[in-house]
Amino acid sequence: MFECWLVSKDGKHGRIRLPHAETVVIGRGPETQITDKKCSRHQVQLMADCNKGYVKVKQMGTNPTSINGVDIGNEHKVELKPGHTLYIVNNLYPYMIEFLEGSTNPRAKIENENRSSSKRTPENSLNVDTETPRKLVKKESNVSPSSSSGRISSCPTQGKSNVQEVKSQGHWSQDLKVSMQDPTMQVFKDDKIVVIKDKYPKARYHWLVLPWQSIASLKVLRAEHLELVQHMDAVGHNIAREHTNSKCAPFRFGYHAIPSMSHVHLHVISQDFDSPCLKNKKHWNSFTTDYFLESQAVIEMLKTHGKVNVKERISDVLKTPLLCHMCKKEQATMPQLKEHLKKHWPT
């Protein structure tokens, strides 16, 4: 069974273990190093479900506890999942959860986790390259589909070394933070961002643009991030232009409303959706409904409102019928949809 850990995103202290199906209460005190008097000593009640991969959160204190910037209130228990950010009180003191494979020596594991956590800060965990901006030497395997016909022949699997590294660092939702530092995955990088191949591409061309800065989700973005987001958009368009041709399907540039990975990332994806990794309705609807926020729309929201507005219950659109993104005809199954899409491919 996996073990659940509560991790301070500020890196102020070691991880806190959340035993399966046991209630853990945290708040102001030496364990969290929170001294804010607005935070109760019993601010938040947590109960991990290591089988289902989430933590039930209940606010116990008077002042608001929130997940991804949304207050949870005193009356409800809310699911905290990998990739989400828990703010203990007043949108301060951010935490995330990780699920690690259980250790046969729990004490040694805890000591190792605390030791590694105490050395890690948000700055040194992600800003691995602060050299003068430079473009990587592009290898054909890094920037083009895996066959000469322009199609992805099979859904890629994780390399052995990467699998071991990801497992040692945490839950699959943390995988991006490993991939963005893997030279074999990188297509371009500078002092602000890195572009990587999507490990499970949903189209013939699918890249991710990520900031080195640790930003958990769209809801964390503020006006001060505008220049960074504009830079991500510009780099995404350049990558699409440089590595495709006039016969390629058009591209879209945007973000998932609620990212599956715990690091904000811009999708640069061709609209052929010709990939064996595109397997289910959730995959499809995440790129063809309002769940996919256009990059320019995000930029305009930051310019106008200083933040990104994500619709309530936006996840419901992932359950809507399968509609072709070109002609809007409904398709009964994914195989039927994928066959239908061939009619729209560039000739």
From Swiss-Prot:
Looking at the record, the residues that make up the FHA-like domain are: 23-72
The compartments listed are:
Nucleus, Nucleoplasm; Nucleus, Nucleolus
What is the protein's given name?
A: Aprataxin
**Gene3D superfamilies per record:** 2.60.200.20, HIT-like
**Chain intervals for the UniProt region annotation (Disordered):** 110-164
UniProt note: domains? The histidine triad, also called HIT motif, forms part of the binding loop for the alpha-phosphate of purine mononucleotide. The HIT domain is required for enzymatic activity.
Report C2H2-type zinc finger ranges. Answer: 322-344
Is Endoplasmic reticulum there in the keyword field?
no
> Where is this chain compositionally biased, Basic and acidic residues type?
110-122, 131-141
User: Where does this protein have compositionally biased stretches of type Low complexity?
Assistant: 142-154
Task: List the catalytic residues.
Answer: 265
